[in-house]
Amino acid sequence: MHEISLVQGLFQQLADLARQNKMTRVVTVTMQIGPLSGVVADSFRFGFEILSAEDDLVRGADLIINTTAVTYRCSKCGAGIESTAERPESCAECDEIFLLAEGGDELILEKVEME
């Protein structure tokens, strides 16, 4: 489960931000995680909960995960199909099965609220 190491990296980033801004506690962390990022949101949340219990800066902080959409572009007609879940079987416009993914691979620290 590589999400644990991602959360550890996030906590280091939060510690750096807290130090730079002279803050002592993280209240809320908002992440943007794309469905093609390779990150399982539930595992990331689990890692956050487990590791935050051991970290004074992040203990009790809320984690908000926003899932970004992927646009699947048809290679034949160019139509775009947005999805946050599974890849569509085919283009809704022309029934082509070769669809190219655009975006959806984000793993972004979007917002942090600190005290």
Sequence positions of predicted segments:
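Intrinsically disordered, low-complexity, mixed-charge
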Residues: 1, 78-79
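Long, charged N-terminal interaction/targeting segments
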Residues: 1-61, 66
